[in-house]
Design a protein with these regions (language model features):
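N-terminal Sec-pathway targeting helices
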Residues: 5-17
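Bacterial N-terminal signal peptides
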Residues: 16-27
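Extracytoplasmic cell-surface/polysaccharide-interacting catalytic and binding patches
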Residues: 25-257
Length: 257
């Protein structure tokens, strides 16, 4: 009799242990972190933000957060953060089902790539605008100072065309109308919206420029809190950053918060 009781107790202990493990396993799988792991999706919180990163002083090909954008959604080879690519793929599939084709034409640019763009324009404009603040203001209509571009972050991308007129009629108008109606469902927002929306500071409107908010809002908050004007250096006109209020009016002058 004693032996039978002992055997029954062992069976009940074994059943209880298996049930407990099963319950814990189900609980783990249904947590957000486990779901992200199970589905292969990256976490939306970046815990490794640094000043060098938000100012573009890194190489995306050496950063595990980044990957090459698949060719079916890109016009050329470029890098973006993985969650941005996954979200854009979902958005592109939804768009194509409604007859709208979305292609990424520009992705991540680090500090040195942005410096090359800035200094090429600076030198090209010098005969007309000189080497002072007027030159910088002209460039800043559509291009960022190195160290202040949202393209540094791997969260921002340009879609389909860089010509303002493209989005005013026909195919381009249908595309921008679809984006303004649906992009928010996938985490994207229009950064430099029309002036008519009340955005009076910063760059000219860019219908093509969209940002993945779940990550870019983290970087913007860090940028506005940590980047100082003495951090701007090593390019033509860097000494003008404070006079131009690059941090407050350009980095902060957006409709995507």
């Amino acid at each position: 009799m004693l032996l039978l009781c002992s055997m029954n107790q062992k069976r009940w202990i074994a059943v209880f242990w298996v049930a407990s493990v099963f319950t814990l396993g189900i609980s783990w799988i249904t947590t957000p972190r486990a779901q992200a792991f199970h589905t292969g999706q990256a976490q939306e919180t970046d815990t490794s933000i640094t000043k060098r990163f938000v100012m573009g002083q890194f190489f995306p090909e050496r950063d595990a957060r980044f990957m090459i954008v698949p060719s079916e959604i890109a016009s050329k080879s470029m890098w973006l953060q993985k969650p941005v690519i996954f979200a854009f793929q979902k958005m592109a599939r939804a768009a194509i089902s409604q007859g709208i084709e979305l292609k990424i034409i520009s992705g991540t640019r680090n500090f040195w790539q942005q410096k090359a763009i800035w200094e090429r324009k600076w030198q090209s404009n010098t005969p007309m605008f000189g080497t002072g603040i007027d030159n910088a203001k002209h460039i800043l209509r559509y291009s960022s100072m190195p160290g202040s571009s949202r393209h540094h972050w791997g969260t921002d991308l340009d879609i389909n065309s860089l010509e303002p007129g493209y989005f005013r009629a026909g195919k381009g108008l249908r595309e921008i109308s679809w984006l303004r109606q649906h992009a928010g469902e996938f985490g994207f927002c229009e950064v430099y919206s029309p002036r008519s929306t009340g955005r009076l500071k910063g760059y000219e409107p860019e219908a093509w420029h969209w940002s993945y908010k779940p990550l870019s809002n983290q970087y913007l908050l860090y940028y506005l809190s940590n980047v100082k004007y003495e951090d701007f250096n090593q390019f033509y006109g860097s000494h003008l950053a404070k006079d131009l209020r690059i941090i407050e009016d350009f980095a902060g002058g957006i409709d995507c918060k």
